[in-house]
A protein has these predicted regions:
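Long, non-transmembrane cytosolic or organellar matrix-exposed soluble domains/tails
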Residues: 202-289
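Flexible helix-coil transition and linker loops at the boundaries of alpha-helical arrays
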Residues: 86-97, 129-141, 172-184, 219-232
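The tetratricopeptide repeat
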Residues: 103, 144, 179-193, 233, ...
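N-terminal topogenic membrane-targeting module
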Residues: 53-133
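Hydrophobic alpha-helical transmembrane segments
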Residues: 36-51
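Structural register within alpha-helical repeat arrays
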Residues: 107, 148, 190-193, 197, ...
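Helix-turn-helix repeat elements of alpha-solenoid scaffolds
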Residues: 42-44, 70-87, 112-126, 157-173, ...
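Residue-level signature for tetratricopeptide repeat
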Residues: 70, 110, 151, 196-200, ...
């Protein structure tokens, strides 16, 4: 999962140094001009307005943009990721639904990876109750139901799991989600993961279908069939490996369970709940042999 920067944020990150330098030159020239003309009071008012404008229009948005950029660089240090999300949620304007909902989703994913399912469930319910869901993108809402389904599966609540996955399936067929494929390779993977989980829940050749859809779309644009110019971060691969490991482990397919457990160990770390399960599984398999 990656947070998107809008055009203004990208522009500020790229050009904030020359912009600050330009504003400094304007301040100096304005001070000299108003001083030369004997309009010192007007000069002070002008410079004050310019400084306020620079602070609120450039400095504050640029700082937030750089924080988002840093958050995108977080890999698998889950505790640091959750801490960063907490800081961003505290710092953001409550009306900025787009960014706030993304930070909340990222925090929920972190909690699930840590194995803190009760708190993750509380976070999802908070998300549903306190956000105006009409203003949130359908793919993000579908993601919350997908995550709740994961929690239900961990707690062996099969009815809740199937109910949540039906909702995911309904969202997965909405044009609003399919349409995002045109804009971001991250949404390609995210959207296909949601659809794959729906098939996974409906048990239509579930594991094979899931493998094909997720891993093929890690490298291919589903609209054009061409390879992606940018590769998605390993988190998607890790999440997919986690689900497939648990599926094959529970269906006694030891060969594939071992393969995906090894994949988890190669890309995860001790913080991850599924990493610990995979490690325990491989250790038990070694003792059995």
């Amino acid at each position: 999962m990656k947070f998107k920067l809008n055009r203004t944020e990208k522009f500020l990150i790229r050009y904030y140094k020359p912009m600050f330098f330009s504003y400094f030159i304007i301040l100096v020239l304005a001070s000299l001009f108003f001083g030369f003309m004997g309009w010192s009071t007007i000069g002070r008012i002008f410079n004050t307005i310019l400084l306020i404008f620079m602070f609120y229009v450039i400095f504050v948005p640029m700082s937030k943009a750089k924080q988002i950029q840093q958050l995108n660089d977080v890999d698998f240090d889950i505790l640091s990721m959750i801490d960063a999300c907490n800081q961003m949620i505290d710092a953001y304007n409550p009306k900025d639904i787009t960014h706030l909902s993304s930070f909340c989703l990222f925090r929920i994913i972190g909690l699930i990876n840590l194995g803190d399912f009760d708190r993750a469930e509380q976070e999802i319910k908070f998300f549903w109750q306190h956000f105006n869901l009409k203003k949130i993108h359908p793919s993000d809402i579908a993601q919350t139901h997908s995550l709740m389904a994961n929690i239900a599966l961990e707690k062996d609540d099969i009815k809740l799991f199937e109910d949540e996955m039906r909702i995911v399936y309904e969202y997965g067929n909405k044009p609003a989600i399919v349409g995002t494929f045109k804009h971001s390779y991250n949404y390609n993977v995210k959207g296909m993961e949601l659809l794959s989980e729906a098939y996974f829940a409906n048990r239509n050749n579930c594991a094979q279908d899931y493998e094909h859809r997720v891993f093929e779309h890690m490298n291919t644009n589903p609209l054009t069939g061409k390879p992606l110019k940018k590769k998605p971060k390993p988190m998607y691969y890790l999440m997919a490996c986690s689900k497939l490991f648990m599926f094959y482990k529970n269906t006694d397919n030891n060969q594939k369970a071992t393969y995906y457990a090894q994949q988890l160990l190669s890309i995860g770390n001790e913080q991850l709940n599924d990493y610990r399960k995979a490690k325990e599984y491989l250790e038990n398999a070694d003792r059995s042999n």
